[in-house]
């Protein structure tokens, strides 16, 4: 069995702290070590506020320079980090790592395979029916975490997730992906909330990085293109594609040091001066 690794947020926070940055790591509201009920719900509004609340907290610490604050968002919270960057002018530099566009994947399905009004309507019907069931039961049905055992015909990206969340690399007893998953209706609100709508108005520095072989790489490529389109502040934006890396390699390095921490140190040092 693999040696147990730090969780995703701590891997980034600890390494950046070792490189001289003051860091704070947090789980999104309603998940993991964070409080709030109902559990296992996502919210474009509240999860954006999570980042802003962290900035609030850092800004009143005596050892923090309020003109030198940056954020890192990973996976679904990579896309949310870009949303925060478009909203919070206190943030001077943003990194979105192995990002998902949560609005897009919830509305259109993986690889835009459900991108039609009829497909979206069918999903809405199903989830609204589930809302009523949940209300009557007084509890939320879970959607299920990463499948285990892994079927032989599982898609590549499911196998990638299994290799992280169901092994010592990333398993945690309070990780929703390692266990019961999000609530069935947990991400429903993203369908109607385009979190990257104003990404091309981001003035501060932004680095989007993704694994070349990640199933999700299209989110980063398209998010970068949208962010720099007609943006007069495009010069401080960058897309970095990591050769041979898959999605979860940027969670913990994938055993091959896939996370470019030298680049992150350089990016934040140059853009938070």
Regions picked out by a protein language model, each given a short descriptive name:
Residues 62-76:
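Alpha/beta-hydrolase fold nucleophile elbow
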Residues 41-62:
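Alpha/beta-hydrolase active-site loop
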Residues 3-8:
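Short, small-residue-biased leader/transition segments that mark boundaries at the very start
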Residues 82-166:
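Alpha/beta-hydrolase-fold enzymes
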Residues 13-35:
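Conserved alpha/beta-hydrolase
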Residues 245-257:
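Catalytic histidine-centered segment of alpha/beta-hydrolase-like enzymes
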Residues 228-248:
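Catalytic histidine neighborhood in serine/cysteine hydrolases
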Residues 202, 208-210:
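Short beta-strand/loop motif that positions the catalytic acidic residue
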């Amino acid at each position: 069995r693999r040696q147990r690794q730090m969780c995703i947020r701590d891997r980034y926070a600890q390494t950046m702290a070792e490189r001289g940055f003051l860091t704070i790591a947090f789980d999104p509201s309603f998940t993991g070590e964070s409080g709030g009920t109902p559990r296992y719900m996502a919210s474009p509004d509240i999860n954006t506020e999570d980042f802003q609340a962290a900035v609030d907290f850092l800004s009143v610490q005596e050892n923090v320079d309020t003109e030198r604050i940056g954020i890192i968002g990973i996976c679904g919270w990579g896309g949310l980090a870009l949303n925060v960057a478009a909203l919070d002018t206190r943030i001077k530099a943003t990194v979105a790592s192995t990002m998902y566009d949560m609005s897009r994947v919830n509305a259109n399905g993986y690889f835009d395979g459900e991108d039609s009004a009829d497909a979206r309507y069918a999903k809405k019907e199903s989830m609204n029916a589930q809302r009523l069931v949940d209300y009557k039961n007084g509890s939320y049905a879970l959607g299920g975490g990463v499948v285990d055992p892994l079927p032989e015909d599982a898609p590549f990206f499911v196998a990638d997730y299994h290799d992280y969340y169901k092994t010592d690399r990333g398993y945690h007893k309070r990780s929703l992906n390692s266990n019961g998953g999000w609530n069935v209706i947990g991400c429903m609100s993203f369908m109607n909330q385009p979190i990257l709508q104003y990404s091309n108005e981001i003035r501060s520095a932004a680095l989007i990085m993704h694994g070349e072989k990640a199933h999700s790489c299209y989110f980063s490529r398209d998010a970068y293109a949208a962010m720099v389109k007609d943006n007069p502040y495009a010069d401080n934006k960058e897309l970095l594609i990591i050769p041979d890396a898959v999605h979860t390699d940027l969670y913990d390095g994938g055993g091959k040091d896939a996370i470019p921490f030298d680049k992150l140190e350089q990016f934040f040092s140059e853009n938070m001066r």
